[in-house]
């Protein structure tokens, strides 16, 4: 793969594109985590592709991120780069865009929020967070996870 990806302009940025370029089925790709260097499982590869994360390159070699490192470094990112939080209506007035037109990812698992998840933030008066120059919120799965943790810690 070295010679294929030495030109930075031609590097595939998504797993789907990498799969096409190499003519290898997506789940047969063998990629390592950029942080811990462990090989990603098929499930981790599939999830990486589904949540539309981008590949990174080190020495002309593509890397992804495993689930454990993704959750860990998302938490680090939140603590290091959190700026402020706003409600949905405020976010729309700040950006002068509808929530449906904004690209918002989950601050915990990094999956893109669906229009329904964005609407839930407004209905339940949950805030969106500005972290590392990007708007984030909670996907439904992480919303349940964080709500369950809060409930368990108060019991």
UniProtKB/Swiss-Prot annotation:
One of its GO terms (cellular component) is host cell nucleus. A zinc finger (unnamed) spans 33-69, 106-142. One of its GO terms (biological process) is symbiont-mediated suppression of host type I interferon-mediated signaling pathway. Gene3D superfamilies: E6 early regulatory protein. The keyword Metal-binding applies. The keyword Zinc applies. GO terms for molecular function: DNA binding; zinc ion binding. It is found in: Host cytoplasm; Host nucleus. Keywords: Activator, DNA-binding, Early protein, Host cytoplasm, Host nucleus, Host-virus interaction, Inhibition of host innate immune response by virus, Metal-binding, Modulation of host cell apoptosis by virus, Transcription, Transcription regulation, Viral immunoevasion, Zinc, Zinc-finger. Belongs to the papillomaviridae E6 protein family. Belongs to the low risk human alphapapillomavirus family. The cancer-causing human papillomavirus E6 protein has a unique carboxy terminal PDZ domain containing substrate but low risk E6s do not possess this domain. Plays a major role in the induction and maintenance of cellular transformation. E6 associates with host UBE3A/E6-AP ubiquitin-protein ligase and modulates its activity. Sequesters tumor suppressor TP53 in the host cytoplasm and modulates its activity by interacting with host EP300 that results in the reduction of TP53 acetylation and activation. In turn, apoptosis induced by DNA damage is inhibited. E6 also protects host keratinocytes from apoptosis by mediating the degradation of host BAK1. May also inhibit host immune response. Forms homodimers. Interacts with ubiquitin-protein ligase UBE3A/E6-AP; this interaction stimulates UBE3A ubiquitin activity. Interacts with host TP53 and EP300; this interaction inhibits TP53 activity. HAMAP family: HPV_E6 (MF_04006). This is Protein E6. It comes from Human papillomavirus 66.
